[in-house]
A protein has these predicted regions:
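Bacterial N-terminal signal peptides that target proteins for export
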Residues: 1-9
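N-terminal signal peptide c-region/cleavage motif recognized by signal peptidases
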Residues: 17-19
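N-terminal alpha-helical modules
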Residues: 22-138
Length: 138
């Protein structure tokens, strides 16, 4: 029972810290926060619950995945313009490795922290990756 309480505590702290720092977070958290607020209101809930986390994490991750594809397309164009095909090739190799890492890391988070992490963790990682790839354009 103590292990379960610890997991619940960690999960609660994750959500509380996310909301406490929402204004300082990047665009990635903003999309999630907006979804959470709208979903809570639409469903007439008093607070966030696992279903809201699941819905909004999935929605936001899907948004980031589309944006990542757009940024990768821009990197490809830029690499062609600069005649650096190896740059794009290297980034695509790291992208495949990154996807494998995220899948395993988030499976671990779901198993050890709790089921909401199966969707919340990938959303966080996709937001971070989007920001990282955008830096490659500058």
């Amino acid at each position: 029972m103590t292990k379960l309480n610890f997991k619940v505590f960690l999960l609660a702290m994750s959500f509380l810290s996310m909301h406490a720092f929402a204004e300082t977070e990047s665009k990635s958290t903003d999309a999630y926060s907006v979804c959470v607020d709208e979903t809570i209101q639409e469903l007439g809930l008093g607070n966030i619950n696992n279903a809201v986390v699941d819905i909004c994490s999935h929605k936001t991750k899907t948004l980031y995945a589309k944006q990542i594809v757009q940024v990768l397309d821009q990197i490809k164009k830029q690499s062609q313009e600069y005649q650096q095909p190896e740059r794009y090739s290297d980034i695509m190799k790291s992208q495949q490795l990154w996807k494998s890492f995220v899948e395993q890391e988030c499976r671990n988070a779901g198993a050890y922290i709790g089921s909401p992490m199966y969707e919340y963790c990938p959303m966080q990682k996709y937001g971070e990756r989007l920001e990282q790839l955008q830096e490659y354009l500058n």
